Amino acid sequence: MFSIQQPLLVFSDLDGTLLDSHSYDWQPTALWLSRLREANVPVILCSSKTSAEMLYLQKTLGLQGLPLIAENGAVIQLAEQWQDIDGFPRIISGISHGEISQVLNTLREKEHFKFTTFDDVDDATIAEWTGLSRSQAALTQLHEASVTLIWRDSDERMAQFTARLNELGLQFMQGARFWHVLDASAGKDQAANWIIATYQQLSGKRPTTLGLGDGPNDAPLLEVMDYAVIVKGLNREGVHLHDEDPTRVWRTQREGPEGWREGLDHFFSAR
């Protein structure tokens, strides 16, 4: 049993979880975001998005100044009050965006894999793909430690591509809409554990953690949470955890931000 009155951290995915996958609406979560803010509970956004995108969303959601996890854990944006921590304002794990881009270009040229990266197109094209405004689409191209792409080849070729990336110290990760290439050592779980440890070091007590996500790339994050909400999503593979004890894990009936609200209602409304 836990409540929002105790030391607590909430980690949340964005697209398909806190945000609607198509409209990007977040209004169903507004009441809970307000309650958590009033209780001084940090809501830590955790996504494949760039830090530039997420800083913009933090302001929209009233979460500015809090830490966030960008690019599937390859980038950690530190909290504003953590200016004494080495690496402030951002910690970047492993291989840089530029280095990954070079690897992908070589694989495409020499082994003829078919894919289109966000670096291959302009912001107008990304806006068309995503439904974002052009100014917001431009933020999606400001990668620091990963590459986002659309796969345009067969499943067999994807397996070969994944194996080649693994040999080179990279991983290939499926998101809600796109695929992502990043350093094999990076992950939402490692980033979350670092943030949890930092809060524990600063407060002297380990906070209870709640995570929310809807896609396969959220599973590592949810595995390291004390409690988890698996938001009903569009991905055919779904989310599967090693420990799905119903006292720890709640699968929502609703999708997107409605499911996010349902998960918070489940764990807190009766407490």
Curated annotation (Swiss-Prot):
Annotated binding of Mg(2+), by residue: D13, D15, D214
Hydrolase in keyword set: yes
GO biological process terms on file: mannosylglycerate biosynthetic process
Annotated GO CC locations: cytosol
EC numbers on record: 3.1.3.70
Location within or outside the cell: Cytoplasm
InterPro entries: HAD-like_sf, HAD-SF-IIB-MPGP, HAD-SF_hydro_IIB, HAD_sf, MPG_Pase
Domain of life (superkingdom): Bacteria
GO molecular function: magnesium ion binding; mannosyl-3-phosphoglycerate phosphatase activity
Catalytic reaction list: 2-O-(alpha-D-mannosyl)-3-phosphoglycerate + H2O = (2R)-2-O-(alpha-D-mannosyl)-glycerate + phosphate
Annotated protein name in UniProt: Mannosyl-3-phosphoglycerate phosphatase
Organism: Shigella sonnei (strain Ss046)
